[in-house]
Amino acid sequence: MSSKKIVLTSSDGESFKVEEVVARKLQIVGHIIEDDCATNKIPIPNVTGEILAKVIEYCKKHVEDDDDVVETHESSTKGDKTVEEAKKKPDDVAVPESTEGDDEAEDKKEKLNEWDAKFMKDFDIKTIFDIILAANYLNVQGLFDLCSKTIADYIKDMTPEEVRELFNIENDFTPEEEEAIRNENAWTFEQDGKQQVPKP
């Protein structure tokens, strides 16, 4: 890892000293560094210290593990041969290359996915909303996707009314419009071959 440190300062004045390679995971910061606009402190105006700490924790873990996964995969593919090279000796039977490196990369990826799931379980839904806003602003795509999946899993069994309440969405349909929409999309409420049309 790079030894150069970058200080990120949150909207509420909290400062975090991080490795440059970690700071670059926040793409908005990466662009500042690439444009040589980075000073020893980079302000992050739309993110509180509490949320920035969580974003940095995610980025640190993914810098370490993403690098390990890439290195393992690259080392496992160095011995790969082209089809033409394999055909040069027609008397020899082509033996597939070892997939040990690929298996190791898969194991690391699986462990990283487990870490992601555990990381998200620590937060209530409001915190997840704050993190997804920060991930969007800072352009941390992996964290944004992880939060999106977590929210999708959270709301998948909710009724439309519960989702509206969670997201503070006002229902602008009349009862007649709601009924018409439910009837048009009745197939989406089928379970075990039986139609389950929820009541408004």
Swiss-Prot record:
Keyword Nucleus belongs to the record: yes
CDD domains: BTB_POZ_SKP1
One BP annotation, GO: response to jasmonic acid
Ranges for region Interaction with the F-box domain of F-box proteins: 132-190
Keywords: Nucleus, Ubl conjugation pathway
Pathway: Protein modification; protein ubiquitination
Principal cellular location given in the protein's record: nucleus
Expression tissues: Expressed in leaves and flowers.
SUPFAM superfamilies per the UniProt record, alphabetical: POZ domain (SSF54695), Skp1 dimerisation domain-like (SSF81382)
InterPro entries: SKP1, SKP1-like, SKP1-like_dim_sf, SKP1/BTB/POZ_sf, Skp1_comp_dimer, Skp1_comp_POZ
Pfam families, per database record: Skp1 (PF01466), Skp1_POZ (PF03931)
Protein's job: Involved in ubiquitination and subsequent proteasomal degradation of target proteins. Together with CUL1, RBX1 and a F-box protein, it forms a SCF E3 ubiquitin ligase complex. The functional specificity of this complex depends on the type of F-box protein. In the SCF complex, it serves as an adapter that links the F-box protein to CUL1.
Protein name: SKP1-like protein 19
Organism this protein belongs to: Arabidopsis thaliana
Lineage: Eukaryota, Viridiplantae, Streptophyta, Embryophyta, Tracheophyta
Gene that this sequence comes from: ASK19
